[in-house]
Amino acid sequence: MAAPTLLTYGTGNVDETLTLAMTNMIPGIKDNIFNENTALGWFYSTGKEEKKGGASLSHGVQYAKSTSGGSYSRYGQMITTPQDNKTRDQWPWKQYYWNVSIDGFTERIAGGGDNAIEDALQEKRDEAEMTMKDRLEIDIFKSSPATDDLRSLPNLVLGSGTEGQINGTNNSWWQSNVLTAGSWATGVGRTQLTNACNTASKRNPTGPVECLMSDQTSVEAYESTLVAQYRYTTNKADIGLTKLLFKEIPWLWSVQANSGVIYGLHSKAIKFYVHSGTDFKFTGFYPANAAGQDAKVGQILLAAALTTPIRRKLFKTTANAA
């Protein structure tokens, strides 16, 4: 890395005012780059579950009803045929890292003593953690995850394909409900989302999904159908809504979400597992002596898995538009 860029002093750049008075260096680094990671936040607050170990993760899955029973009278024959209606899925852990490095000059010399404005080491860690969260949000909505990436919503919430080592193309009980929507202005978007919500409500676990997750455009398409009614009922000249619900289900949106897609999620049907000992764990700094550098390096580590034990409870509507 190049030498630090210093301010240019001298008579052409610094006058009497700057010679006699210091610039007021306001503490804090103002974020002009990172986005709100809505989906990751929901998974951490609602769908997260910590686990300690295991080479992989697995749920017991019920895939059929028992038919070994019925009515009878007196000496009537009872069905005693044994049945096997259960199996298991399997989900491998996915590991993430982000490097945190600092050179000796910044840590000991420039950033030491009374002239330090910020804690350089902590700022480096905070930046790496926020970057890692941005990466996870992207991966949650990635259409084609890499082998080492988390499984993503576009693949988990699908009416086909193998997830958790169970074939959803051949097994209808391992398929999410996927509907093609359309314009909200003409009512197609609302009709399809209503149908998807009602269908999910009758599937175990009983009740509606807990969250709708979409892109900004889909949220605004729905919101535009509500504004006129909102103004009429409140007598306020307001053209927006601060909290969005659909059939009393909270509706969130992410900057990384798939265009025109609305997901229906339930915390018992989609699980975000995090290894309790590797949940944004910082390894600590160690010398970068191998490269002959006056520097320290460390990593922030995460081991996690985005899974679905009840794929049929999840849904999505696609092609949503204003």
Segments from the language model and where they lie:
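Flexible, glycine/threonine- and acidic-rich loop/arm segments that mediate assembly and lattice contacts
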Residues: 2-322
